[in-house]
Amino acid sequence: MIGAFARKLFGSSNDRRIKAYQARVAAINALEPEVAALSDEALRARTDEFRAQLAAGKTLDDLLVPAFATVREAAKRTLGQRHFDVQLIGGMVLHEGDIAEMKTGEGKTLVATLACYLNALAGKGVHVVTVNDYLASRDAGWMGQIYSFLGMSTGVIVHGLDDGQRQKAYACDITYGTNNEYGFDYLRDNMKYRLEDMVQRGHFFAIVDEVDSILIDEARTPLIISGPLDDRSEFYNTIDTFIPSLDKSDYDVDEKQRSVALTEAGMEKIETLLRDAGQLKGESLYDVENVSVVHHINQALRAHTLFQRDKDYIVRNDEVVIIDEFTGRMMQGRRYSEGLHQALEAKEHVTVQPENQTLASITFQNYFRMYGKLAGMTGTAATEADEFYDIYKLEVVEIPTNLPISRLDEDDEVYRTQAEKYAAILAEVERANKRMQPVLVGTASIEKSEVLADLLLKNGYKQIDFGDPKGLDKLYAAARAGKPAKLFAVLNARFHEQEAYIVAEAGVPGAITIATNMAGRGTDIKLGGSLEMRIPQETAGITDEAEKAAKVEQIKADIERFRDIVLNAEDEIEIEPAKGSKPAKTAKRPGGLYIIGSERHESRRIDNQLRGRSGRQGDPGRSKFFLSLDDDLMRIFGSGKLDTMLTRLGLKEGEAIIHPWINKALEKAQQKVEARNFDIRKNLLKFDDVQNDQRKVIFDQRIDLMKEDSVVETVTDMRHTYIEDLVAKHVPEHAYAEQWDVAGLKDELHRVVGLEIPVDEWAKEEGIADEELLARIVKVFDEHMAAKVAQWGPDVMRYAEKSILLQTLDHLWREHLVMLDHLRQVIGLRGYGQRDPLQEYKSEAFGLFQEMSAHLREAVTAQLMRVEIIPPDQPQELPPMEVHKMDPNTGEDEMAFANVSLAPADSVDKSARDPNRPETWGKVGRNEDCPCGSGKKYKHCHGRYA
């Protein structure tokens, strides 16, 4: 109460911040006449002037006012668009490294040019992040006209570019690209072996468009570069055949937590099925040998009970393709991890692809936190302001609209069943279509969009493609005639390619568009249709300039007329009179785009995004949600009580309840879900930060190594430290000579480096100390390496040292990632022992990292001591420069130490092998027993270093 009064009296913190920008806005406006008087050449020359001022000691903040005035003038001359005052404020928010919340149609794309230009003056590169390739290409080409006019270069990063093209794009002053491309380029760069092969040049400043989608919705999604493991498709198919045998009483499903678990009866049934199929080892399902089987049973259960076809994924071209729950878009190339994707493939009877091993990974949370300055734009961020600040230290600033919003957001209509709800939606669509009002129906899944499409088809409507000129001609003809044509388009993951065109024409009179969630986000829906879309499409192939000009004028007249029709498509509804009062009155509902939501999403933000498609730039509009007690949100969060209440109220079939209280109750349910999801993301980030800290150490180490011409000091230090650790292990400090494990030390030295070092004889010498023993071993190792340098030459050995060090580091880092994944999966169980899983994970992950570092010293030392260089005149088969190449039979990574040939001898008669002389072994298969007699597989013994 007091807070509300204070806000009314003094204004909110947001109001005060907006007010603080007004002085700079006034200064920019005051410069406008002066800048407008400049010639094109003089305006372009200001870029060099600003750079000179920066070099002389001025800051970017000092240059903000003249730089913004320059960009505004350049936009007027190139695009015919002038930045509004509120857009200048948006640009200032972005420059300060915060989030500008700007409503749909307020020109976020144009706003970004202000902060991009100003920060690009520093010469360190500015990255603009979009949600798909289409928007990246569109915005780079569109806004690139401003940058080019001012003498700045623009690059675009999209799927399918080679490294050379990517390097050129990143070298530009301003680079546009998708979040996926930026993240994967970073991971790929950190798998390169030469600095000149890397494509990115640092992380100075990024502006993230649709920042809520990328930093909130996709925050939990890790970017993973992986390589295939061994093929277990038959195993997945076998496991899948067991699931239909289970009854609902055999497992418990928790939809809120998205988890499923076998009951006691279910376990017994599965045990019997596994035993009969020969897949059960030992006596019980929960014996240690069956841990993997239990995991895959659980994944198969999840695939069948928690994941729905056409909602969570679709099947296309013999593949299971994930559907983004927030946008309804296909996530081509993305796969669920830990065997879940294979379980879905087995469920749908498509080809089961091999599981993958993680080679490199990072979450969007950690990738974007690497930038020195991060900013974002979106139409809906206020509901997630706490999360943006807690995780990214980004403040959300709500930018006022240029014109007041005149959209009417009506209360929800709640029906008892889905059938009643769909009937009400159909009736509402028909009423709107009769008055030529365009309608956008938002659905939460492909399945729901197709249910509505079927309903329209059964009621005399025809489905067309708004991206197809023939379909659009029918829509335009009906609009010109002022008669509804009963045509509709569907926009979901199945029709992703035509997304922008379908959305752009959703504002044509009589258009009915069914869209999953926020598909088509980033493309404005303009009342009457899109001039930018129609002109290129309808003038293509017209060569005569006069004919072309006439066509353009006709399109403009069309759109102006269509806009008037839509603006006047008002709805008159009767308001029931109170008892004893006069007859019913009528009230008008505005025209414009009518948004119909077919159900509430878990997040208020997604609902607000849907509403925000209507009422752009002061246009009228209308939005309403139609709900049923069968909807996921209502069902999961207590629809039983509501159903009882509605029954008691005497709600009849087909009737709806409409009340602000219902809206408030739903909002509270959504807030609970949002809070839970925030906690999940925050907790996951704490765990990922552990791996991220280690990732930074490894990636920084790789960069440092690649910068060095010679790593001889590094490998020498590693060699000496390895020897010190080995001697300390077998010859403890202050121990008596009789307590020394001399035999163990000698065997270990021979096993690792293949040298016969007489440590047993040295140990027998009177008065020898452990320091002397260590010094002699170090001397032998150093002399051995010096001999190799003398034999092959310093340049060759420097190359070998660097290659072996980098590739061994990569190989061990990949193995370490697998270990961390395994640790992460089981660490939660520590909570049952009253121990904090996060602290346990930190401690054990640090221990594993230390082990990896020790293993790195050992492996690099072993390889360099054994390395043989193939002379140039001999044929050599170097593996291609790939990240990985998996053996299809064993699943082993053949690229573990790629591009440094250790020159294995040809296979020899096994009987001629001397266990103590590796040079007599010839080529040994990785799965053979090691010829040294240890009893281990070669790949786990001497082959570990070969």
UniProtKB/Swiss-Prot annotation:
Protein localization: Cell inner membrane; Cytoplasm
Pfam families in the record: P-loop_SecA, SEC-C, SecA_DEAD, SecA_PP_bind, SecA_SW
Protein name, entry field: Protein translocase subunit SecA
Gene Ontology BP term (one): protein import
EC supergroup of this enzyme: translocase
Compositionally biased region (Basic and acidic residues): 907-917
Function: Part of the Sec protein translocase complex. Interacts with the SecYEG preprotein conducting channel. Has a central role in coupling the hydrolysis of ATP to the transfer of proteins into and across the cell membrane, serving both as a receptor for the preprotein-SecB complex and as an ATP-driven molecular motor driving the stepwise translocation of polypeptide chains across the membrane.
InterPro entries tied to this protein: Helicase_ATP-bd, P-loop_NTPase, SEC_C_motif, SecA, SecA_CS, SecA_DEAD, SecA_motor_DEAD, SecA_preprotein_X-link_dom
Superkingdom of origin organism: Bacteria
Main location: membrane
Assembly and oligomerization: Monomer and homodimer. Part of the essential Sec protein translocation apparatus which comprises SecA, SecYEG and auxiliary proteins SecDF-YajC and YidC.
UniProt cofactor note: May bind 1 zinc ion per subunit.
Stored HAMAP family: SecA
Its membrane topology: Peripheral membrane protein
Catalytic activity entry: ATP + H2O + cellular proteinSide 1 = ADP + phosphate + cellular proteinSide 2
Assigned protein family: Belongs to the SecA family.
Chain residues that bind Zn(2+): C930, C932, C941, H942
Cofactors: Zn(2+)
Chain spans, region Disordered: 904-928
Gene Ontology CC annotations of this record: cell envelope Sec protein transport complex; cytosol; plasma membrane
